[in-house]
Amino acid sequence: RRIQLTPGTTTVFVTHDQEEALAVADRIGVMNKGKIEQIAAPQNLYQRPATEYVATFIGLTNRLPGASNGDEAVVFGQRVPLLAGSAKVESGAVLVRPESLTLALAGSSDSHVGERARVEVIHFLGSLVRVDTVITSGEYQRWNKGEQLKATVQLPASELPAGLAVGDDVIVTPRPVAALAC
């Protein structure tokens, strides 16, 4: 990175490693089937993807049932801001990053809103924890072309409910932050 920042130096990287690209690039071009989908700074690509392809290619993305209501999206019955100029996806779907969701053990005082889910996998990543869940609420069980609806939640390790284990019932809730696309 130090060499890249030397005045007058131009570098071009070609990589399939999204984390590497986000870490070393000032601008990133995302290609899909030989066509450029978006060129932008790493933070803009991640936070404001121009297309559904870019949103799912750069970072983890949940495709959840939801609806757009002007500048808001409704996800699991909760209103969340919709990013201005958000990418368009098929009707009835909203794209949400894992860090834009939270969870609580079902039946706890923190579990009053959201959708019931079952914990499938817990990935401890040091300061972060990624929890893969399967939505078990009747309305959404078979939403995505007959497949089980899954939601990945990523949160600081300090926010992980004490004693959370694979197989536990939880409530997944969107945080009051912007959805990527609708």
Feature locations, PLM:
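ABC ATPase nucleotide-binding domains
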Residues: 1-53
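Residue-level signal for well-ordered alpha-helical positions
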Residues: 27, 57, 107-108
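Gly/Ser/Thr-rich helix-start
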Residues: 30, 35, 56, 60, ...
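ABC transporter nucleotide-binding domain
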Residues: 41-72, 76
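Non-catalytic connector elements of ABC transporters
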Residues: 61, 71-182
